Regions:
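Residues on the lipid-exposed face of transmembrane beta-strands in outer-membrane beta-barrel proteins
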Residues: 30, 119-123, 155-159, 202-206
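Short acidic/polar hinge/loop motifs at secondary-structure boundaries
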Residues: 2, 46-73
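Outer-envelope beta-barrel architecture signal
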Residues: 37-39, 99-103, 115-117, 126-130, ...
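Short beta-strands and strand-coil junctions in structured, solvent-facing domains, enriched
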Residues: 14-15, 36, 48-49, 76-79, ...
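Extracytoplasmic beta-strand/coil segments of soluble accessory domains associated
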Residues: 2-46, 67
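Flexible loop and strand-edge segments within Gram-negative outer membrane beta-barrel domains
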Residues: 139-146, 150, 160, 164-214, ...
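Short strand-turn segments of transmembrane beta-barrel domains in outer membranes
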Residues: 76, 88, 92-123, 133-134, ...
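Hydrophobic, lipid-facing positions within transmembrane beta-strands of outer-membrane proteins
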Residues: 24, 87, 101-105, 115-119, ...
């Protein structure tokens, strides 16, 4: 038998939340922290974390934008800084490699009025490529006052300058509303979050037979409105 090395906590059907009562905590080989300040999340090599608390916000990531997920287990602070004490998770975004157009759509509906919808369109024509994705997810939750709603979009444009050089830029925006009723023993009233997260990046890359390199710039931003039940 094998023991999993990566763990992620969940508090309900959908949505991890932030602040008091939040889930989405991740740990690699027992290291991660609560909140997850000891495990670094990257998107295409760019750090993703909330500036105030220093931890990633799991509800800000969209599955349709991801081509693959790379996991580096063990301390990696020499390369990635103090947030990578437990390891690194790198989300690699989609790229259209084959000539043509591909469109995908996923829709699911289940208990507690839970709805999941995702859409993606990928284009490759000559030297030009693009990826556009969108999603809308919601649920009433398995308890009263535990609703969650999320909608977001992602777009990437790329251009092959030559066989060895390419340039691309992308933007990702996600907004979600989450409610937390607290525990049955200690209920919370109006513990709501209204959070918008965004990122944009630009990169120039080269790939030769024996060498490769790149120059990239990125900018992350967010707006958070949180009523976490503190009493004065």
């Amino acid at each position: 038998e094998q023991v999993p090395g990566l763990f992620t906590t969940s508090r309900g059907i959908m949505g991890y939340g932030v602040s008091t009562g939040a889930a989405g905590g991740m740990s690699l080989r027992g290291i991660g922290g609560s909140p997850t300040a000891g495990l670094l999340v990257l998107i295409d090599g760019h750090p993703q974390y909330m500036g105030l608390m220093g931890h990633p916000i799991a509800d800000a990531y969209q599955s349709m934008m991801a081509e693959k997920v790379e996991v580096l287990r063990g301390p990696a602070s020499v390369l990635y800084g103090s947030n990578a004490m437990g390891g690194v998770i790198n989300i690699v975004t989609r790229r259209q490699q084959e000539e043509g157009v591909k469109t995908n759509m996923q829709v699911g509906y289940g208990s507690y009025n839970t709805l999941q919808t995702e859409f993606s369109n990928r284009v490759k024509k000559g030297r030009f490529s693009s990826v556009v994705t969108g999603s809308y997810n919601r649920t009433d939750g398995h308890r009263p006052d535990m609703g969650f709603e999320q909608y977001g979009g992602y777009a990437k444009l790329g251009y092959d300058i030559s066989s060895f050089w390419k340039v691309w830029g992308d933007v990702n925006v996600t907004h979600f509303n989450a409610s937390n009723p607290g525990t049955i023993q200690v209920p919370l009233i109006d513990n709501d979050s209204r959070i918008t997260r965004g990122m944009t990046s630009f990169a120039l890359e080269n790939h030769y037979e024996k060498t490769s390199g790149g120059l990239s710039f990125f900018y992350n931003w967010g707006r958070h409105k949180i009523n976490d039940g503190y009493q004065i």
